[in-house]
């Protein structure tokens, strides 16, 4: 069989195209990097990979907003080079100190000794100096602006979304908000825009990102959202976050999700039943609790911690009114995975007022595990109308029926 000939340099051309910049608007480009195989970030699973977004503005002053994780220097530089020689960059804006955003500041600075670097003051200046030494940073605050030619960029500090140095950059000329961590998702895709991807999956990843990264700072996130709204109803038609896809067709959807679901603390009538089990007894109790919710007309999800990562639990937890956490007793303590969940949950500081908790579990000679779960849930602010639900050794069918009925009555009465 005769092989079809390929154009000379075909593979090189394809690779060059893959590592080319993506135009967002005239003279504004995405030049970031894709970490396809990343599966963990700060303790939570990133099954869809990670995108480190950086943005290039071609104006009288060539401006780069954020960089990428240091190991992606070549990818970043190749994408920039598809538009302009990286040594021609005049201004670098660091919206966030964290190394997945700032890791290539030394790379860019090394190419241009006259580079001007702007970041938040004082936290950004302190953080970047600690990481990379004194590169002559220019600290900016909310209300400060920077003229780069026909564009004037405005800065708004968004502290603790999710570090003290965070800020966003607004390009009024193009109506683009470079939002840094706000409105982001850990989601690697060859398609850059929201409308080029499965919107349901993008929104799911945005929710998971909020639940596991931004949730402890929901009041700060709400303030950042308010600042965006204050720009005016027609001021932003594109949101370019530091991770994930760029919002252009569904800007209103992600703003509404942050406002009405993520930061509001509004709870839905749904339940999650999370547990670990040693020999199956606590698992049987978990199923009875789940059945009790279903009998009361409450949607419920059963989550065995052997098969579900704690970061996925927190995604479902975000707006669940009912949370059941179960563990047998192991060495007078809850099972390690349950203890890890409770520790992780405590760190994310969810708003638990109005949330109903059901601590439960089996035991042999002392119910120390379930009682420890109950204590931690009570300290976290859960209401515990059933106190702690326990069963010694293997629960009988009669005991399982009692548990199911108790949960049904409780959920039906609320």
Q: Across the structure, where does each feature detected by a protein language model lie?
A:
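Conserved beta-strand hairpin/beta-sheet module of binuclear metal-dependent hydrolase folds
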Residues: 21-81, 168-171, 175-178, 282
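Short N-terminal or domain-adjacent regulatory/targeting segments
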Residues: 238-267, 340-341
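Metallo-beta-lactamase
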Residues: 22-26, 118-166, 220-226
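Short, solvent-exposed beta-strand-terminating loops
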Residues: 28, 177-196
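Short, charged N-terminal beta->alpha structural module
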Residues: 274-295
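FMN-binding flavodoxin-like domain, especially the glycine-rich phosphate-binding loop
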Residues: 189-192, 200-239, 244-246, 288-305, ...
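Active-site metal-binding motif and surrounding structural segment of the metallo-beta-lactamase
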Residues: 60, 71-118
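Active-site neighborhood of phospho(di)ester-bond hydrolases with catalytic His/Asp-centered motifs
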Residues: 65-67, 89-97, 116-121, 177-180, ...
């Amino acid at each position: 069989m005769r092989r079809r000939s390929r154009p000379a340099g075909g593979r090189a051309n394809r690779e060059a195209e893959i590592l080319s910049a993506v135009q967002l608007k005239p003279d504004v480009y995405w030049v970031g990097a894709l970490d396809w195989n990343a599966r963990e970030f700060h303790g939570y699973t990133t099954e869809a990979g990670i995108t480190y977004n950086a943005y290039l503005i071609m104006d009288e002053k060539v401006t780069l907003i954020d960089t990428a994780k240091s190991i992606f220097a070549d990818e970043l530089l190749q994408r920039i080079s598809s538009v302009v020689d990286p040594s021609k960059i005049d201004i670098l804006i660091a919206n966030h100190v964290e190394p997945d955003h700032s890791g290539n500041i030394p790379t860019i600075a090394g190419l241009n000794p006259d580079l001007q670097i702007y970041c938040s003051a004082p936290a950004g200046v302190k953080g970047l100096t600690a990481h990379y030494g004194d590169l002559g940073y220019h600290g900016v605050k909310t209300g400060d602006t920077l003229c780069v030619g026909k564009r004037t960029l405005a800065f708004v500090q968004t502290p603790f979304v999710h570090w003290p140095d965070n800020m966003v950059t607004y390009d009024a000329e193009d109506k683009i908000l470079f939002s840094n961590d706000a409105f982001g998702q850990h989601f690697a895709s060859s398609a850059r825009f929201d409308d080029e991807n499965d919107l349901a999956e993008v929104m799911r990843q945005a929710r998971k990102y909020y639940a596991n990264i931004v949730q402890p700072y929901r009041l700060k996130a709400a303030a950042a959202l308010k600042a965006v709204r204050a720009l005016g109803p027609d001021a932003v038609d594109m949101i370019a976050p530091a991770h994930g896809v760029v919002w252009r067709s569904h800007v209103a959807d992600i703003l509404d999700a942050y406002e009405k679901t993520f930061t509001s603390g509004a709870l839905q009538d749904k339940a999650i039943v999370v547990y670990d089990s040693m020999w199956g007894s606590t698992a049987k109790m978990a199923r009875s609790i789940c059945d009790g919710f279903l009998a009361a007309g409450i949607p419920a999800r059963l989550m065995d911690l052997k098969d579900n990562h704690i970061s996925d639990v927190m995604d479902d937890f975000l707006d669940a009114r009912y949370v059941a956490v179960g563990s047998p007793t192991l060495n007078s303590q809850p099972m390690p995975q349950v203890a890890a969940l409770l520790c992780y949950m405590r760190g994310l500081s969810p708003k638990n007022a109005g949330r109903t908790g059901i601590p439960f579990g089996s035991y042999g000679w002392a119910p120390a595990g379930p009682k420890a779960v109950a204590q931690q849930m009570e300290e976290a602010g859960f209401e515990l109308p059933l106190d702690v639900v326990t069963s010694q050794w293997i629960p009988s069918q009669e005991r399982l029926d009692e548990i199911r009925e108790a949960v049904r009555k409780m959920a039906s009465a609320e």
